[in-house]
Amino acid sequence: MTGVFDRRVPSIRSGDFQAPFQTSAAMHHPSQESPTLPESSATDSDYYSPTGGAPHGYCSPTSASYGKALNPYQYQYHGVNGSAGSYPAKAYADYSYASSYHQYGGAYNRVPSATNQPEKEVTEPEVRMVNGKPKKVRKPRTIYSSFQLAALQRRFQKTQYLALPERAELAASLGLTQTQVKIWFQNKRSKIKKIMKNGEMPPEHSPSSSDPMACNSPQSPAVWEPQGSSRSLSHHPHAHPPTSNQSPASSYLENSASWYTSAASSINSHLPPPGSLQHPLALASGTLY
């Protein structure tokens, strides 16, 4: 019995040592295997089969610790005929990445809403509370110089509407912005329309309205001159020439007085009594009503 036992022990040990060596070599060097493999033995079939026994030190696909040990990778195996298969790795749902991502996303969405509030407060500084009611603060009015007003007035008399190049040129020449020129023309047009609607004379038709430095005093009324002054004007026609602003009634009186005085002088030269012509001369050179 001892002889038989001695013969069986080496065979068992050699089989036990050869199987792990072959399987370990196959697992560490899978790329060196040829695509056409010879017929496998019982030991090889145990290794390549998913349900077969696995050597000590390596994780079996069906073991409980397989999913945890090889979580980020996939375990590949080769079948008997060279076909390859894979076991899918375990998903990352255990680590609750999706829930944490939604939490961070919600916090990120809440942050811009909090930052936008001070921006609105900064962009609306023109609203002021007066007696508990919001009131907008108006911008200060533009003060134009006399030179700028004269230039704008002359340009407005030429045309009431400016094109974009003309407005830019006028604003650059006067040292104003295009917005200021545009607003001035708009206000001027509205003022003219309001005056014309009320039936009044626009200021452009008044004398010397284009020159702001000129004196716009009203004209003096026509002077009704007596008889002596009319005679003096007839004897000295170049002393006081009639002005263009004189009314037609006064010019007509002067012409008639000169004609009557010339007629009276001719009559006085032919008639000896000079006192007889005083009454018709007084009637002729008198005032007309």
Swiss-Prot record:
The keyword Transcription applies. GO terms for cellular component: chromatin; cytoplasm; nucleus. This is Homeobox protein DLX-5. It comes from Homo sapiens. The modification Phosphoserine is found at residues 34, 217. Phosphorylated. Phosphorylation of Ser-34 and Ser-217 by MAPK14 enhances its transcriptional activity. Phosphorylation by CaMK2 increases its protein stability. It holds the Pfam family Homeodomain. Residues 137-196 bind DNA. The keyword Iron does not apply. Residues 1-49, 198-251, 270-289 are annotated as: Disordered. GO terms for molecular function: DNA-binding transcription activator activity, RNA polymerase II-specific; DNA-binding transcription factor activity, RNA polymerase II-specific; HMG box domain binding; RNA polymerase II cis-regulatory region sequence-specific DNA binding; sequence-specific double-stranded DNA binding; transcription cis-regulatory region binding. Residues 32-48, 206-220, 242-251 have a biased composition (Polar residues). Interacts with XRCC6 (Ku70). Gene3D superfamilies: Homeodomain-like. Belongs to the distal-less homeobox family. CDD domains: homeodomain. Transcriptional factor involved in bone development. Acts as an immediate early BMP-responsive transcriptional activator essential for osteoblast differentiation. Stimulates ALPL promoter activity in a RUNX2-independent manner during osteoblast differentiation. Stimulates SP7 promoter activity during osteoblast differentiation. Promotes cell proliferation by up-regulating MYC promoter activity. Involved as a positive regulator of both chondrogenesis and chondrocyte hypertrophy in the endochondral skeleton. Binds to the homeodomain-response element of the ALPL and SP7 promoter. InterPro entries: Distal-less_Homeobox_TF, Distal-less_N, HD, HD_metazoa, Homeobox_CS, Homeodomain-like_sf, HTH_motif.
